[in-house]
Amino acid sequence: MTSSSSWVKTDGETPQDQVFINFRGVELRKNFVSHLEKGLKRKGINAFIDTDEEMGQELSVLLERIEGSRIALAIFSPRYTESKWCLKELAKMKERTEQKELVVIPIFYKVQPVTVKELKGDFGDKFRELVKSTDKKTKKEWKEALQYVPFLTGIVLDEKSDEDEVINIIIRKVKEILNRRSEGPPSKCSALPPQRHQKRHETFWGIELRIKQLEEKLRFGSDETTRTIGVVGMPGIGKTTLATMLYEKWNDRFLRHVLIRDIHEASEEDGLNYLATKFLQGLLKVENANIESVQAAHEAYKDQLLETKVLVILDNVSNKDQVDALLGERNWIKKGSKILITTSDKSLMIQSLVNDTYEVPPLSDKDAIKHFIRYAFDGNEGAAPGPGQGNFPKLSKDFVHYTKGNPLALQMLGKELLGKDESHWGLKLNALDQHHNSPPGQSICKMLQRVWEGSYKALSQKEKDALLDIACFRSQDENYVASLLDSDGPSNILEDLVNKFMINIYAGKVDMHDTLYMLSKELGREATATDRKGRHRLWHHHTIIAVLDKNKGGSNIRSIFLDLSDITRKWCFYRHAFAMMRDLRYLKIYSTHCPQECESDIKLNFPEGLLLPLNEVRYLHWLKFPLKEVPQDFNPGNLVDLKLPYSEIERVWEDNKDAPKLKWVNLNHSKKLNTLAGLGKAQNLQELNLEGCTALKEMHVDMENMKFLVFLNLRGCTSLKSLPEIQLISLKTLILSGCSKFKTFQVISDKLEALYLDGTAIKELPCDIGRLQRLVMLNMKGCKKLKRLPDSLGQLKALEELILSGCSKLNEFPETWGNMSRLEILLLDETAIKDMPKILSVRRLCLNKNEKISRLPDLLNKFSQLQWLHLKYCKNLTHVPQLPPNLQYLNVHGCSSLKTVAKPLVCSIPMKHVNSSFIFTNCNELEQAAKEEIVVYAERKCHLLASALKRCDESCVPEILFCTSFPGCEMPSWFSHDAIGSMVEFELPPHWNHNRLSGIALCVVVSFKNCKSHANLIVKFSCEQNNGEGSSSSITWKVGSLIEQDNQEETVESDHVFIGYTNCLDFIKLVKGQGGPKCAPTKASLEFSVRTGTGGEATLEVLKSGFSFVFEPEENRVPSPRNDDVKGKVKINKTPSANGCFKDQAKGNESPKGQWQTYIENSSTNIPSEAHSSQKTGFNGFNGMYSVCVLYEMYSH
């Protein structure tokens, strides 16, 4: 059949410069395609149109035309899938596109791209009807073509579109592609995005959520809102990937759109004018848009640009000038346009530049593992590490943790590890952890340098120096690091590096990403500079020893960090080993193995003395400094921090030297130090640590010049007797602990917040102590000569903690202190005070080992804030009055005269969830009525805890919520399951677990038989169940512990009862998830044992044991099992509880109205013969001395 196709050709064009148009003729030939053909002809573009589609044009001719074309326009319209011809052409176009011989531009004429790709609606129905008469192979080819071609960058023409404008856009795009193909490969800053058939940008897990968040900020749903969003984040975090994928998703919705990649590098290589030219060419699809003035160019094209909304992506912007060069004054941007700017410098995202900022977060652990596995196992999810695959799962997590969710770092590590065995993975991980100990050139960080190299190169030389210095002081306080860096003048260097994501500041600490830290240390080893100033940072001990031994140190060395734990022998150096290091700023000689370097030998020695003619040193830290003083030629003019712990110095330096920048001095345990005269001119000193300087007898009066001193530590200065009459106007913390000869204290600062006088020889406090209105903590523990406290101490309105433990001669506590409204902690153990102080604000009160107290105040229940009350070994205490409602901890262990307790024991029990522990162990004079009251309280507490837990989130941690203990040998009557001995076995009816179990009350009676021990009392719990099919499942966990350390060994003289309540949430979850027969009874057992603090079995006998299930309140409870449903061999315990609130299961009687509504199950029990597992559950009740353990088993018939 002859062809009647129409051709348009202009002189000078080759037949290859042609466009093939694929369309549905009966629908578009006489309107849209006709207008498009004329437009192409006017621009001199060859176009091929099959004018005889309905007549059956020879297919081979059409396919030849496609093969001879450079561009194909695939125009999808509502009736497109009626034509086999259209689909055959489309399949050929797909083939040529995959061969990269053809560029296809999809045009969606009154259909949406998703309709075409997913064959929706009438469009899809027509296709399915058409392919009924075709073979499977052809159907597959056509369907793949329909799914493939619409995925390319296309143009949408809907009912509201201006047809002429769309045709002009098509023509401009065709011309631009033809020009680009004739010029060869595009430059890296090409304004046009890569075609979709080319390799797609690397993506990562979790990007869909980030795209959604970014879309919300851009407000794509609002046609009238112009939004400019800045995308920021550290290098490698995925900014470019995110921007590219968003562009690919949305560009076909905009008639004008452009993405400019790597603007920083492009502007460096080609200049801003060239960049602006490419930008306008991409946006306007015009040739030779010469840019001499950026603003003039925008004005020249303003009317044309304002015709339609634009989508603009500016990737990797490094300064504002780049944005201004491309966007100008922005008066050419139509409402509804969307602009995205990605950068690694947060400081660029000022309000005038963007509407909002999106900081790309790191990958979650889950997504990071998936991303890492993609590269470490070459995308083979089946090869991903899992159970039974050696140590790969753990190693994978370690690598992910190291990268902290950085996608590019994960990708590079994964590629490095691809195909390697487990031992190689281990070596690589160890290299990452130990990189600073490896010799230069052997570090793995070369592989990761690509993540940061672009951002690092963009830094100024000052910023690079600062970054490499910060790596030396990682995780240090922000103010400290800023002082070291800025000692030569004011600077915002830290803020600048934070904005560029090179460092971060969290909780006041300066830190950086692990991969950058590793790179920084490597660069510090290799760094050089043209000005020949110090740039080298030495870390490896071999290198440092060689430099010192051979006197190779020069002005190129900036810092030395020598770890003495790496050195195995003593070294002797010449006196001028450091003399040539004129630009040395940081010198640290330390030990990671032991901060005190306990070895008696000094490893670095200078037998001829030492020259330190250094002027630039900011930081001098020398553990076990071997000389009597810092050399006279050392200039501390720039010194910020001086640390000489465990040194041989007798004085800091000769005479007073100007040290205007010195803020921190630490000379701790320099036992020969006898004077501080040399520090008289360190007027900006903030902290002075002289702990353990045992030869120091006095402090100089010129310390008063230290106007900024806030911290002074004199702990263990055993020769110090007093302080001079000075005023340190800024001092907040003064430590005189262990100054055993210190007899007289006087106030040297009105701003003190913490004062430590413990272990001193003072007899009294000065009357003007009331001046310390900011004092929060006063510690006078072990001041054995202290006899009285001044009334003025009661004027300390800010005091929160007062420690008087061990002040054995102190027998009075001033009554005038009742108005100390902020005092929370009051420790009076081992004093001679006769009456408990009446300070209602106290939360923790300790009166342990006080033999003068016989009674507590009757108004103790008014101490509403009191939570911890310690009364151990108060041997004359006879009565415990009613306790306050919020008390969580009461310990009267060893109160040998205690006989009675108040009834009720607690004035009211709060309905909120409050853990509590009441310990009455070794109170052998306790009367029976007191024991019964303790039991009644325990029962009520279990009720209220069950009710409170109903209102709690089930995510709370399984734990012991209540425990108590007292001398006795009888099991309380309200425990429904009990037995003689250590094991209780029982059988529960089918569906028993539908009773909304809330917890378990536990009880055990233990015989101690004069046992001595320091063991801890803890409870663990274990459960095992059978699923009815021959297999079983189990859980094991530590329910909780209330452990108190006590170093006093004593004899326990009687049997004791322990009662506890646990929520055992994991057990409840297991019960609810049983997979066994639905109507089978459940057998279970509990086994109690006593363990020592080391976990071993104690030689103690469990006399009796028991428990009760505690269910949720009555109104929410499913009917519980009756007594006759519970099988057992032990007598049924039907003794009613003290308040008569329990339901008799056999008779089904309800609880009396108005009584406690929580239900404690009352049933018979079964004595077991054996146990199948050894899991422990526990509760504390015996002064932290023994471990009572419970073994729980459950299985189904």
Curated annotation (Swiss-Prot):
Domain TIR: 15-178
Source organism superkingdom: Eukaryota
EC number: 3.2.2.6
Broad EC category: hydrolase
Effect of deleting the gene: Shade avoidance phenotype in the absence of shade and enhanced growth of the bacterial pathogen P.syringae pv. tomato DC3000 (avirulent avrRpt2 strain). The constitutive shade avoidance phenotype can be rescued by RPS4, a TIR-NBS-LRR protein that confers resistance against bacterium Pseudomonas syringae.
Catalysed conversion reaction: NAD(+) + H2O = ADP-D-ribose + nicotinamide + H(+)
One term of GO molecular function: ADP binding
Pfam family, one: LRR_14
The LRR repeat ranges on this chain: 614-636, 638-659, 694-716, 728-749, 750-774, 776-796, 797-819, 820-843, 845-862, 863-889
Protein's GO biological process: defense response to bacterium; response to light stimulus; response to red light; signal transduction
Keyword DNA damage tagged: no
Keywords carried by this UniProt record: ATP-binding, Developmental protein, Hydrolase, Leucine-rich repeat, NAD, Nucleotide-binding, Plant defense, Repeat
InterPro entries according to UniProt: C-JID, Disease_R_plants, Leu-rich_rpt_3, LRR_dom_sf, LRR_R13L4/SHOC2-like, NB-ARC, P-loop_NTPase, TIR_dom
Location of the active site: E89
UniProt domain NB-ARC: residue ranges: 210-480
Domain observations: The TIR domain mediates NAD(+) hydrolase (NADase) activity. Self-association of TIR domains is required for NADase activity.
Chain's role: TIR-NB-LRR receptor-like protein that functions in photomorphogenic development. May function downstream of phytochrome B (phyB) signaling.
Name of protein: Disease resistance-like protein CSA1
Species assigned in the record: Arabidopsis thaliana (Mouse-ear cress)
Highest classification ranks of the organism: Eukaryota, Viridiplantae, Streptophyta, Embryophyta, Tracheophyta
